[in-house]
A protein has these predicted regions:
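Hydrophobic N-terminal alpha-helices or hydrophobic patches in metabolic proteins across all domains
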Residues: 1-444
Length: 444
């Protein structure tokens, strides 16, 4: 039967069956500039597949494909979109591993699929603050070894009367993605065994962490004005750390490649064979996986309990005038467990969000601006006349250029400059009134 030997049909059927997750995937790509990194991982998978196709005998993983496709269909109504997509790409990994790489499961391809998912914003939200704490502590130790009296408080390094903010790029989330992307490509090209893949990823993570520690250390000297550099000094330090990190990852993986070259990579050469019964079961599972999302969509709009806040009428001594919600606020209003209001004080636009519990729905202002097409550039930490800390950035779109600052606070003077730090604190402090204030004004 022609279908039996047509492996590409199997993969195409899977792709069609998983239509719902692709719809979610491309929606996320269209609403965040950061998530477009995932396209690089997809391109890498396609290129690696066609490179290996001519070198490797295909094997059939159809039983694993059938099981994972069924798991996708059964779990679809209960899993959030990201986890559904993980199940879908796991099933695709089984198919691609068997056809293109002659293996039951290629963890290098799977890691590239995972990196292709829209996870950068989520990684920044959940891991950004812990990684900044870790990097800040290590940076403080290095600076002390160099004779400087420095201590870390939150995500700031204090030196005398100066406070140097460990900014979001220093958390290394984007460098973590890039480093793991590079490592995934290399372990796939060299067809590493599982043991070598794990070793490569562990070493890559350590190198990425080290690179970010040295980046934060260099930026401390610059921000604390202990050294003088041109205006592009900040970018130069970041680019240098990035290049050295990538070189380190390549060097280590090449070294790992030479370990025990006789080690088996578990490549199989049993041929690609599928029985008529397996074909029928596979097609039935694909049909079920295709249909389930149609019936599940209507059950996913659970009602969100929205907290109601007593919004201020005066901000920094100026009377506030309420405005209608703009495109930025409307985009993130769905399922937001609180209130959002937009004001002006005559010169600036002020967005105030109110929640009473830790939630992933409280996005950073930079994510909101990025989602509707603004390019974002971080600015140094701002300390206002009331000694309050603000995280700031510039947002540009066409001819429009804005300076935007944000902070989150409670009535008892607790405050945070980014949502990741706030989230981890709010997890253990439920049922408080949290106010997220974003101030945007035209850049001079």
């Amino acid at each position: 039967m022609a279908f039996r030997n047509s492996k590409i049909v199997l993969i195409l059927l899977q792709i069609v069956a998983f239509w719902s997750v692709w719809r979610w995937y491309f929606l996320r790509l269209s609403t965040s500039n950061d998530e477009t990194y995932g396209i690089l991982a997809i391109v890498a998978i396609i290129a690696l597949c066609f490179k290996k196709r001519a070198e490797t005998s295909a094997v059939s993983n159809v039983n694993f494909i059938i099981v994972t496709t069924l798991i996708y269909a059964v779990s679809f109504p209960f899993l959030p979109p990201l986890l559904r997509t993980v199940v879908a790409v796991t099933s695709l990994t089984f198919a691609i591993s068997g056809w293109f790489f002659g293996k039951k499961f290629h963890f290098g391809i799977w890691s590239l699929f995972l990196l292709s998912l829209p996870i950068v914003a989520s990684l920044q939200f959940y891991l950004g603050f812990p990684m900044r704490i870790l990097i800040g502590e290590a940076t403080a130790i290095l600076l002390k070894l160099n004779g400087l009296v420095v201590f870390r408080e939150g995500v700031c390094l204090h030196f005398g009367e100066q406070s140097v903010w460990i900014d979001a790029p220093c958390s290394g989330v984007k460098m973590l993605w890039t480093g793991m992307f590079l490592a995934s490509i290399l372990v796939t090209i060299y067809n590493f065994s599982l043991r070598k893949i794990i070793l490569s990823f562990v070493c890559a993570f350590g190198i990425i962490l080290t690179g970010n520690i040295f980046r934060a250390t260099g930026l401390f000297y610059l921000e604390a004005e202990l050294i003088k550099m041109p205006s592009f000094g900040h970018e130069a330090i970041g680019v240098s750390a990035f290049i050295l990190t990538c070189v380190g990852i390549v060097a280590v993986i090449l070294k790992i490649r030479n370990f025990d070259k006789s080690e088996s990579t578990n490549q199989l050469n049993s041929g690609f064979q599928i029985s008529n019964f397996q074909i029928k079961i596979f097609v039935i599972n694909c049909i079920i996986a295709f249909i389930v999302p149609v019936f599940a969509v209507g059950n996913q709009s659970a009602k969100v309990n929205q907290a109601i806040g007593n919004f201020p009428t005066i901000f920094e001594g100026k009377q506030l005038q309420e405005l209608g919600l703009s495109e930025r606020e409307q985009f993130f209003l769905n399922d937001f467990p609180g209130e959002i209001k937009r004001f002006t004080d005559g010169n600036r636009e002020i967005i105030i969000r109110f929640v009473t519990t830790a939630t992933r729905k409280l996005h950073s202002a930079s994510d909101c601006f990025s989602a509707i097409g603004y390019s974002i550039k971080p600015l140094p930490l701002k300390i206002d006349e009331s000694n309050k800390n603000w995280a700031c950035f510039t947002a540009k779109k066409g001819e429009e250029s804005l300076n935007v600052c944000e902070r989150i606070y409670t009535e008892n003077s607790e405050s945070w400059t980014d949502v990741s730090a706030w989230y981890w604190s709010a997890l253990s402090n439920e049922n408080k009134d949290y106010w997220a204030v974003t101030v945007a004004e035209t850049a001079e």
